[in-house]
Design a protein with these regions (language model features):
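Mature catalytic domains of secreted/periplasmic carbohydrate-active enzymes
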Residues: 1-212
Length: 212
């Protein structure tokens, strides 16, 4: 399966259901793949919304209180999280809707880093680091708690910018003896896991802009 598919919704359907609604729900919360025991029913909608239709595998029965922890810990180990989504006569029950809302809220902020992140050789004093598999000049620090500062080791050069992904709030940092010290301030909204971006020098930064 494509490594960019960090979460997969496994729809467990009984009775009638609107497949278009289900696939659109998956897309809207940041999932890039779905599965079902009735794949033929999902084929057209998946093509319509550019969602990958995976072969069905065993999934996890998760709740809003543990879904983000489970997703992040699996991603730390380069694993996708397959989440069982019960659908009864086309509807989600209250617990399932709360689960989906929790995923949506978190993925709305951090889905890009989460889907496209892979393990990084960098180390950090708290949390862990992923790097963008398509643009390795972007590193992502995942933090469960928010200390006053963190220290990142393994960078060759001082980065151009360090920021919370949420609202792109810049953070103060200093590089000395190969150690990047980042001073943290709490973001506007604190999630179960918070993510900051370390932006290194990019290839396009070498382009000289000429005005005519």
């Amino acid at each position: 399966m494509n490594p960019d598919f960090a979460i997969v919704l496994n729809f467990k359907t009984t009775g009638d259901f609107d497949v278009d609604f289900l696939v659109k729900t998956a897309r809207n919360i940041g999932a890039r793949a779905v599965m079902s025991s009735d794949p033929a029913a999902f084929k057209e909608a998946c093509e319509k919304y550019t969602i990958f239709l995976a072969d069905e595998q065993a999934g996890l029965d998760l709740a809003s209180v543990n879904v983000i922890d489970t997703m992040v810990n699996n991603r730390k180990n380069s694993e996708a999280t397959i989440i069982n989504i019960p659908v009864n006569d086309g509807k989600f029950d209250e617990a399932t809707q709360k689960l989906l809302d929790t995923i949506n809220s978190w993925m709305h902020q951090f889905g890009h880093a989460f889907n496209e992140g892979k393990p990084s050789p960098l180390t950090v004093s708290d949390g862990f680091i992923l790097e963008n598999r398509h643009a390795d000049y972007q590193k992502y620090v995942f933090l469960k708690d928010i200390p006053a500062k963190i220290v990142v080791e393994g960078l060759d050069k001082e980065p151009n910018r360090v920021e919370w992904i949420e609202h792109r709030t810049e953070l103060d940092f200093a590089m000395k003896d190969g150690k990047l010290t980042i001073n943290l301030i709490k973001p506007d909204d604190v999630f179960d896991w918070n993510v900051l971006r370390i932006q290194a020098h990019r290839p396009e930064d070498n382009i000289i802009h000429t005005e005519f």
